[in-house]
């Protein structure tokens, strides 16, 4: 509706230019917003105020000229009024609102989608947890966020690839290998003083048991270096397979898994450093190599290669992001834990050093999750240092509830996740409240058929939808494409969970006040069934884009 109104306003301005009532000139960006109070109309624009200086007229005078041109010029507009210093308020015809229902029915599963992305290639890299232990609930929030952002961008017409970056090159892999080897020796009877720096979780014992089952005592007879290398590879592979399975159980499948080690094996770290040196962006000081991140606004330059010749994580990130853009992505999006916020300026510096615009890299920061049970905080880790895993949470509350709860707040704000609330089958549970709205609509259709009323939508009399409840529900449906687009370009899937709760609320309010199946009024019955058909489409589409099911029975 906003886009239609913008087009109408633009046509009106151009008409004023053509007839001389306004002096021809540049048309500003036309802002159309929903007023805070319903009495001020359905929409408002400040375009007259924006044009006043150019036109050398008072804003209200410009508004009066535009209102005269727009009045009666569109089948959208019921009436217009000028408010305050020059705002133009629009009251939309009920018939225009009702036409949204025809659009929804025609679009079906595509309702809400757009082509604003124009096929632009986008990569969303998320989760990317070290293959040194199972995913915890913090990873779960990042997983839900990254997957939902990728789906939103796809729905907005972008060509999206999901990628997992495997951090398999670094000291953590040696630590994993040593942890596995020591647990293996312990299982075979050696007395081991297990270091605190090693991975403490019971999953390391599982890896060791697996090795004993398959290989017996073979690795008691090899050098420590070879034993560490073996358990680093075996442990990493097993853990990564477990991570992949947990993510699949959570409804997430990656298009590509990218190994950090491959950057070294294929010489990409070396060539990236050489490219930056050739550009004068990497210099040597005190035996180390430094990137001139201060050239791009960072607070200090950053080490790429230490004086002992060992590369930093930053070196890998330079090579990795260089590789991403070399693969043809126009827009690269990284989903990180909020504790990495200090890393943002240096990576933006890299992107600019590669000759790209800083905006070609989008970074989503995901804050911590606090677990609750009936409002009481739950211990997030055991004495051995094991965090509550994503698998444990999904097994307890289910995939749908977990995904919805992870997406209920802005990703950069802390999230309270109440396990008992997530399982509750009541209106207090937001995911139940939303899914029940969809199931309830399907139940209404079943009831209609049981009463001999077969829904037929070929010639629905939409003008019969006249009550405030009817029209309020229609208006809420009409904003879904705008919500979807805003969620995509701003990386904010919580906009969809908010919208779903509002739409479910509008539906439940409508149903409590309105009779849907009225045998003595068959045309009104068909109109209201058509309205609910459109609500069901919108609920399902919005849930689907978040990776959540829309059950027909509950």
From Swiss-Prot:
GO terms for biological process: arginyl-tRNA aminoacylation. GO terms for molecular function: arginine-tRNA ligase activity; ATP binding. One of its GO terms (cellular component) is cytoplasm. A motif ('HIGH' region) lies at residues 129-139. Its EC number is 6.1.1.19. InterPro entries: aa-tRNA-synth_I_CS, Arg-tRNA-ligase, Arg-tRNA-synth_N, Arg-tRNA-synth_N_sf, ArgRS_core, DALR_anticod-bd, Rossmann-like_a/b/a_fold, tRNAsynth_Ia_anticodon-bd. Pfam families: Arg_tRNA_synt_N, DALR_1, tRNA-synt_1d. This is Arginine--tRNA ligase. The lineage of its organism: Bacteria, Pseudomonadati, Thermodesulfobacteriota, Desulfuromonadia, Geobacterales.
């Amino acid at each position: 509706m906003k886009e239609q109104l913008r087009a109408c306003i633009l046509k009106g301005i151009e008409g004023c230019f053509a007839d001389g009532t306004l002096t021809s000139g540049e048309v500003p960006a036309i802002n159309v917003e929903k007023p805070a109070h319903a009495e001020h109309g359905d929409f408002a624009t400040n375009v007259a105020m924006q044009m006043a200086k150019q036109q050398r007229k008072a804003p209200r005078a410009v508004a009066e000229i535009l209102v005269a041109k727009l009045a009666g010029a569109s089948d959208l507009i019921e009436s217009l009024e000028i408010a305050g210093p020059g705002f133009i308020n629009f009251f939309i015809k009920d018939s225009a609102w009702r036409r949204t229902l025809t659009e929804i029915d025609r679009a079906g599963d595509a309702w809400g989608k757009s082509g604003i992305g124009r096929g632009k290639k986008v990569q969303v890299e998320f989760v990317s947890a070290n293959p040194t232990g199972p995913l915890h609930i913090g990873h779960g929030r990042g997983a839900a966020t990254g997957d939902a952002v990728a789906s939103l961008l796809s729905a907005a017409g972008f060509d999206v690839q999901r990628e997992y970056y495997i951090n398999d090159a670094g000291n953590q892999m040696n630590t994993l290998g040593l942890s596995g080897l020591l647990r293996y020796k312990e299982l075979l009877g050696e007395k081991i003083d297990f270091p605190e720096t090693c991975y403490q979780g019971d999953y390391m014992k599982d890896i060791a048991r697996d090795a004993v089952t398959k290989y017996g005592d073979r690795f008691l007879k090899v050098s420590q270096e070879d034993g560490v290398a073996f358990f680093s590879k075996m442990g990493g592979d097993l853990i990564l397979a477990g991570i992949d399975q947990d993510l699949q159980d959570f409804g997430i499948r990656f298009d590509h898994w990218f190994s950090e080690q491959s950057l070294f094996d294929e010489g990409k770290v070396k060539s990236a450093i050489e490219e930056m040196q050739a550009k004068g962006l990497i210099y040597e000081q005190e035996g180390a190599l430094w990137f001139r991140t201060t050239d791009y606004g960072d607070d200090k330059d950053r080490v790429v290669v230490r004086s002992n010749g060992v590369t930093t994580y930053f070196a890998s990130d330079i090579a990795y992001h260089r590789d991403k853009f070399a693969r043809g992505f126009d827009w690269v999006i990284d989903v990180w834990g909020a504790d990495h916020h200090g890393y943002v300026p240096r990576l933006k510096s890299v992107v600019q050093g590669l000759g790209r615009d800083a905006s070609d890299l989008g970074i989503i920061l995901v804050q911590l999750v606090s677990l609750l049970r009936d409002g009481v905080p739950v211990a997030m880790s055991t004495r051995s240092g094991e965090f509550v895993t994503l698998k444990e949470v999904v097994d307890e509350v289910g995939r749908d509830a977990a995904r919805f709860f992870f997406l209920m707040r802005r990703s950069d704000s802390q999230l309270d996740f109440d396990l008992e609330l997530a399982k509750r089958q009541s209106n207090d549970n937001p995911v139940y409240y939303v899914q029940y709205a969809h199931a309830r609509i399907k139940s209404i259709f079943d009831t209609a058929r049981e009463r001999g009323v077969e829904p037929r939508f070929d010639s629905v009399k939409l003008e019969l939808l006249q009550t405030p409840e009817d029209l309020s529900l229609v208006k809420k449906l009409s904003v879904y494409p705008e919500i979807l687009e805003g969620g995509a370009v701003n990386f904010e899937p919580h906009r969809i969970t908010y919208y779903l709760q509002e739409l479910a609320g509008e539906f439940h309010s409508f149903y409590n006040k309105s009779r849907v199946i009225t045998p003595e009024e068959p045309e009104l019955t068909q109109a209201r069934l058509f309205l609910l058909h459109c609500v069901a489409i919108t609920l399902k589409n919005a849930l689907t884009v978040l990776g959540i099911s829309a059950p027909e029975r509950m």
